[in-house]
């Protein structure tokens, strides 16, 4: 077992060796530009790009013509949300999303608000899931877009996307789904789930970073205003010379995900449960954040009461985990996802996200259980609040002196 141990698979995944192997020739001998139509170098590159497009489409039940290459899921989210809003704004300027979306969606929505669009931000239930009835109630005649993620990046909670998609479809509203954290882990099918636009990332499924895709439905056709102007690549949706090695890597990652997903889901769920039960055996006052029933296999988001998340992370340097999402973990604000779910500020501050994946082992899980057990106990020994609770004091009944 190698130290440090990686348990942050929601932030990124290692590139699978089989993916790297598929990519390497496109850095060396096969260096053509896929847009070069007049010679064999370009034809070979284009052939590789189209084969990868087929693989990504197959993984989500789409047709290859519906896959647009991007630089990653942040770009895909921006292109979907802003592109659809700008195209359909003559019909209305109302958008609907959830408070626990990824920042790429939330900040795109805020940017649109500054341009005169109106956005309804829905609250999830206590278990982190969004009730489809709330989406239905939020729709208005001028609603043009609903954007709800499939699986949350912090809690791993899976939303009832098929039902939300059906509600949007019946209302004639475009439905975008950020499927970054679910694709390759659990089934995601654009037809069964009534999805019009879907964001996909390569580096969340053992492919390279800086590579993504956007699914854009053709029947009924969904239209977007391009965010990037240029040579008209990707049917005008996304200009710019294609990243052939990255695309080949994403295609291979999609193929492996399709072939290995179901067996891997069983294995990783077993590891997650081993971790959860082990931590619960070691420690008291442990809270799992979000639904355990509706959750991606490798996610465990836990609050260790009376322990500061940042202090705990420093104490467990040998295990790579995160408190909050990697995109926002530079700020010490409590997780906005957990706060939107109604988790108290103290518990949100003490939350740790474990992410298990393809290369995680039982040995690593057992090591993490022992390490977290030891370090949490040590930090709690320094907490007078923990001592008071153990002595039966109800902290809610105490009137604290106001220092200000």
From Swiss-Prot:
Binding site for pyridoxal 5'-phosphate: 73-74, 153, 181, 201-203, 241
UniProt-annotated location(s): Cytoplasm
This enzyme's EC code(s): 2.8.1.7
Catalysis: reaction(s): (sulfur carrier)-H + L-cysteine = (sulfur carrier)-SH + L-alanine
Active-site residues, record numbering mapped to chain: 327
Record-listed [2Fe-2S] cluster binding positions: 327
Keywords: 2Fe-2S, Cytoplasm, Iron, Iron-sulfur, Metal-binding, Pyridoxal phosphate, Transferase
Residues with PTM N6-(pyridoxal phosphate)lysine: 204
GO cellular component, one term: L-cysteine desulfurase complex
Enzyme class: transferase
Cofactor(s) essential for the protein: pyridoxal 5'-phosphate
One Pfam family of this chain: Aminotran_5
GO function term, MF aspect, one: pyridoxal phosphate binding
Family matches, as Gene3D superfamilies: Aspartate Aminotransferase, domain 1, Type I PLP-dependent aspartate aminotransferase-like (Major domain)
Protein's pathway: Cofactor biosynthesis; iron-sulfur cluster biosynthesis
Gene Ontology terms: biological process: [2Fe-2S] cluster assembly
Main subcellular location: cytoplasm
Domain of life: Bacteria
Subunit structure: Homodimer. Forms a heterotetramer with IscU, interacts with other sulfur acceptors.
Function recorded in the entry: Master enzyme that delivers sulfur to a number of partners involved in Fe-S cluster assembly, tRNA modification or cofactor biosynthesis. Catalyzes the removal of elemental sulfur atoms from cysteine to produce alanine. Functions as a sulfur delivery protein for Fe-S cluster synthesis onto IscU, an Fe-S scaffold assembly protein, as well as other S acceptor proteins.
Entry similarity comment: Belongs to the class-V pyridoxal-phosphate-dependent aminotransferase family. NifS/IscS subfamily.
Protein name: Cysteine desulfurase IscS
Organism of origin: Anaeromyxobacter sp. (strain K)
Gene: iscS
